Amino acid sequence: MNELIKYKLELLPDSPGCYLHKDKHGTIIYVGKAKNLRNRVRSYFRGSHDTKTEMLVSEIEDFEFIVTGSNTEALLLEINLIQKNMPKYNIKLKDDKSYPFIKITNEPFPRLLITRQIKKQDGLYFGPYPDSYTANEVKKLLDRIFPFKKCKNPINKVCFYYHLGQCNAHSICQTDKAYWDGLVEDVKLFLTGKDDKIVTGLKEKMLAASQAMEFERAAEYRDLISGIATLRTKQRIMSKDLQDRDIFGYYVDKGWMCVQVFFVRQGKLIQRDVNMFPYYNEAEEDFLTYIGQFYLDQKHFLPKEVFIPDTIDQDLVQAVVPTKIVKPQRGEKKQLVALATKNARVSLQQKFDLLEKDLRKTKGAIDHLGQLLQIDRPYRIEAFDNSNIQGTSPVAAMVVFKDGKPSKKDYRKFKIKTVTGPDDYASMREVIFRRYSRVLKDKLEMPDLIIIDGGQGQVNVAKDVIENQLGLQIPIAGLQKNDRHQTHELLFGDPLEVVELPRNSEEFFLLHRIQDEVHRFAITFHRQVRSKNSFSSKLDGIEGLGPKRKQALLKHFKNMTAISQASVDEVRSLGIPEKVAQALLDSFNEV
């Protein structure tokens, strides 16, 4: 379990919702639901598990969560998220075939079926349902209420269900299309929650049966009404009108805004987008700017409707978003916007909590590092690394960390000027001297600790320059890597010794970050220099092509391939004479 997960586990709410486990690549590998997100997600990282769960846990590097309004919402959201992301550890539910739907066929005598394959041209589909049992329970209830054709028997042959009162295909004339159309509409209303008409009719039949002393029949109607009530649980995650819409919510705090967008397709929440950024104007104005830019990106599908919070000017949004804009005022639709807003608040609070915890731990790491090395608290740390390939294009780089955080405006790059060939010691000597003689000359801020990305030899060279050549007293430490190029040992002292540093300590993580950052910065600079040198060398020998013209070519064309494909006029446009331009292009043809 890494540090990020440890932080996030402390931030989980005691609310129902869904959680999404991610691997080291950021890929969603498992989607789950929970009545209590805090308890459920924490359980993955506590105690022992079976082999399958251990495999899952071993790959988890991060997780997200979405708060829902009820456990049922969490269940339905889980289904939709699995369909959308197809996580590998949800293998039994990884495609649409795994989810049952209720289908009304487009046949002249419609039938109610359960299917796992969707072919929209063949009928109407309702779902998905979480499992076959649930879908079958709903279908059984529908079969008892709506007398659709139950089998594929010829229409002139009476089936078993006709005698149960559950099939009218034999008794209804084949030409009575209006009857079947009406039955289909009743089912559509029923499955989208608009079942008042059906319940009223059943209550009337129950009362009539009771008055006629047909108590068994009355009990059947009573059970049907009870079954309908069970299915009446309202879902904010599932939109009953099956519309495509985007639902926006936002929350602001401490100068930051979080915008949360729920993407609802065919009435189901399939994905969300979370974006956090500092805002500089009124919150409502910056939100308008955000939503106006949101649909300029071709990646964002424009739905039939966009829901926005009631604090936003609807007309202004309508002016920049070419679809129907809705500010829900009541009921389920308003609750959907409230849910998006709630998740925006939770996400923003999580960001602040993580930042605060990270800051506390980083400051603690700096304190502990100072204590470990027996020096003053190293507020400003400057780290150095060399980079070259067999002595070609040698460079060095310096990064600065202030209070445990990178200060990129203080980063510096160095081209090695006095060293020929691959000599890391001499290169380090040059760079340290150039850096700190400049610090002395310009009276710049001195570091509290210098870190050398290297072993004993390079550290001793740096100490010699600092103490003997420049007369400074600055603590210097070295970071050695192992054969896998990973942070391995901290060297410090006089003489240098390995400082024992627990691999799971905050101090180790801080030093690891510093070493990775200075190495990245040095490597990037070396690649830039090597590329530029390679570019220039290929242009050497062309008469009339001096350094300034080479620089102009590099700036304009970026690479040799682009130059080789250019015309004489394009090259001349950079102020290069026609004769020189022609000679340049001819040199590529010769190759």
Curated annotation (Swiss-Prot):
What GO MF terms are annotated?
Answer: DNA binding; excinuclease ABC activity
Q: How does it assemble?
A: Interacts with UvrB in an incision complex.
Task: State the protein's purpose.
Answer: The UvrABC repair system catalyzes the recognition and processing of DNA lesions. UvrC both incises the 5' and 3' sides of the lesion. The N-terminal half is responsible for the 3' incision and the C-terminal half is responsible for the 5' incision.
The GIY-YIG domain, residue ranges: 14-91
Family, as annotated: Belongs to the UvrC family.
Ribosomal protein keyword on record? no
Stretches assigned to coiled coil:
none
Per UniProt, what is one Pfam family of this protein? GIY-YIG
Official protein name in the record: UvrABC system protein C
Q: Describe the location of the UVR domain by residue ranges.
A: 196-231
Keywords for this protein: Cytoplasm, DNA damage, DNA excision, DNA repair, Excision nuclease, SOS response
GO biological process: one example: SOS response
Q: Does the keyword DNA repair apply?
A: yes
**What organism does the UniProt record list as the source?**
Streptococcus uberis (strain ATCC BAA-854 / 0140J)
Q: State where the protein is found.
A: Cytoplasm
The protein's predominant localisation is cytoplasm
A Gene Ontology term for the protein's cellular component? excinuclease repair complex
